[in-house]
Amino acid sequence: RLVILTKERGKITVFANGARKAVSQLRAASQSFVMGTFTVFPGRDSYTLVKAEVREYFSGLPLDMEKLCYASYVCEFMSYYTREGCYCVNELNLLYVTLKALEQGTVDNQLIRYAFEVRLMDIEGQGIHAYTCVRCNKKELKYFNAKAGGLLCEACGKELKLTRTVSETLIYTLQYIQSADLTKLYAFQLSEEAMAELKYVADRFREAYIDREFKSLEILSSL
């Protein structure tokens, strides 16, 4: 049984009969982290894989335990937001550039992870409000509050509990992640201090709006 994210029908369950056999033409397509063109036959509750043309294996991911764990988390997080019957071209493109960035290894894995989280949640309409105050729409931003939905101006921030002052770097970083062309999403680096700030904001926001434990995240935390 395979789970495939498609641009036309969203996340679908597919059975690849005989894929485990060494001589099966579907064997390569049944591996993890494979992208390509899949021909499926629809059934009552699932699909049957008939043919597959693999275009990308991301073969570098299984060779590195840390990359493998991050890639697994990316797929699990994507699975949480996707379902069958949806047009998922933005999600599929984001997944591709993210796995490619992890495989290439030129950008910090942790930065890729959090940029992916922020961008996907924004695509799904659950993103951090990062351009104006989430309460009054002022453009002068100073605080972050997860339960409020994002960034706040000084006046609104002082009225709420559990707010945290944010830097101009953090504000720009969030805006860049949400608006950058996907081909340039991972074309930046952050200082250690800025990375810690992004991590805090992304973690608090995810915890506030996603009530699910990710198994791959538990493994990542143990590395």
Identify the residue ranges that each predicted region occupies:
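Non-catalytic alpha-helical scaffolds and adjoining flexible linkers that form interface surfaces
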Residues: R1, L5-L223
